[in-house]
From Swiss-Prot:
Leader peptide range in chain numbering: none
Pathway note: Cofactor biosynthesis; molybdopterin biosynthesis
Protein name according to UniProt: Molybdopterin synthase catalytic subunit
Oligomeric form and interacting partners: Heterotetramer of 2 MoaD subunits and 2 MoaE subunits. Also stable as homodimer. The enzyme changes between these two forms during catalysis.
Species in which this protein is naturally found: Pyrococcus abyssi (strain GE5 / Orsay)
Binding, substrate: 38-40, 104-105, 120, 127-129
Length: 148
């Protein structure tokens, strides 16, 4: 998949978790926390068929790099990695991978949660949800019907 710690991964390619762990590991690593986002089968009472992720690639990569660098400055961690998938993803498929290494688990957990929250808030990746009731753009907690 490449050796970058920040990446947009185009379907059909998926995450290589062992590679991700190796990229953030060092002799000072005491623990690693992994967040792996998945496409679930239900949202707000609607049956989800798939999610379609689109991105402004260059800007998304730059913002993910900023978030990673901010996490390295803000938390006492060893390293961090952010990979986000793009394309049509079926129920059960992986969507985002955040891996954080630290000397101690608490810092790794806190940094990982912060990174996931910041990616959702700041990175120009758009999520379209295809359900049994139609298609919706997901904007935070808002669901906006797709107009055709």
């Amino acid at each position: 998949m490449g050796k970058s710690k920040v990446s947009l991964v185009k379907k059909p390619e998926d995450f290589n978790i062992e590679e991700a762990i190796a990229l953030v590991s060092s002799s000072s690593t005491g623990g690693i926390v992994i967040f792996l986002g998945k496409v679930r089968d239900e949202n707000l009472g609607r049956k989800v068929e798939k999610l379609i992720y689109e991105a402004y690639d260059e800007m998304a990569i730059k913002e993910m790099e900023r978030i990673r660098n901010e996490a390295l400055d803000r938390f006492p961690i060893v390293d961090a990695l952010i990979w986000h998938r793009i394309g049509e993803l079926e129920v059960g498929e992986n969507t985002i991978l955040v891996v954080v290494s630290a000397k101690h688990r608490r810092e790794a957990f806190e940094a990982c949660a912060w990174i996931v929250d910041e990616v959702k808030k700041r990175v120009p990746v758009w999520k379209r949800e295809v359900t049994d009731e139609g298609e919706f753009w997901i904007e935070g907690d808002r669901h906006v019907p797709v107009k055709r």
